[in-house]
């Protein structure tokens, strides 16, 4: 009986598939084929999902760290009411800082909702912005210990202004490098106004810290309130 020839296993060839990133860039009427090729040829991860994920994680940690500076009173029952009242300024600084960090998270969520591609420059600008967010619990703790001291108010105001500046730079970098989808001109104007609110109020708060520290704190409170009035329509 004639033996059957041994069949050699068929080699399976895998073809490297290049993802089509053209769907993530601006419409063809705004972006030519050369711009799409220029973005696709960059040897760098282009998916913004990981950048957004680590940003959300940093915001969650920063919001949690704020409350760690508020210690519960450890006194007997007869002094508990006065001890709770004594912690009111610290609780107020916590609430203010929570609102400011929440405002920056909303602004970051809104801005990066337009971003479809990430390059090295935008990645590091986002990390610089996250650095300013992580420092905010420290600035808040100093302000809670010395709520009417000009150096503490200056530190807090400078931190808030740095948060706004780095986020604004990241936004305009993404728009200038065509890493975002097409943004209407009126929407760009709205974002520009929003990015100028918090640094302006923070700088004014720093300027009047030595003569009117309470007014400085009021200006800090106005940052999330004023920004909410110009919230995005998306």
Where are these predicted regions, by residue range?
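Multi-pass alpha-helical transmembrane bundle typical of ion/small-solute transporters
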Residues: 14-234
């Amino acid at each position: 009986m004639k033996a059957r020839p041994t069949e050699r296993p068929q080699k399976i060839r895998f073809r490297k598939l290049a993802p089509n990133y053209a769907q993530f860039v601006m419409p063809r009427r705004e972006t030519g084929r050369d711009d799409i090729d220029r973005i696709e040829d960059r040897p760098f991860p282009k998916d913004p999902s990981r950048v957004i994920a680590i940003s959300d994680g940093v915001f969650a940690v920063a919001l949690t760290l704020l409350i760690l500076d508020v210690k519960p009173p450890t006194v007997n029952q007869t002094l508990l009411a006065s001890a709770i009242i004594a912690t009111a300024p610290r609780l107020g600084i916590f609430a203010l800082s929570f609102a400011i960090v929440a405002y920056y998270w909303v602004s970051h969520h809104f801005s990066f909702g337009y971003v479809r591609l990430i390059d090295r420059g935008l990645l590091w600008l986002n990390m610089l912005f996250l650095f300013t967010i992580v420092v905010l619990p420290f600035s808040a703790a100093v302000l809670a210990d010395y709520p009417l001291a000009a150096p503490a108010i200056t530190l807090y105001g400078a931190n808030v202004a740095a948060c706004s500046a780095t986020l604004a730079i990241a936004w305009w970098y993404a728009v200038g490098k065509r890493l975002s989808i097409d943004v209407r001109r009126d929407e760009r104007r709205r974002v520009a106004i929003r990015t100028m609110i918090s640094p302006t109020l923070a700088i004014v708060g720093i300027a009047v810290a030595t003569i009117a520290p309470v007014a400085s704190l009021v200006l800090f409170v106005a940052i999330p309130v004023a920004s909410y009035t110009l919230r995005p329509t998306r």
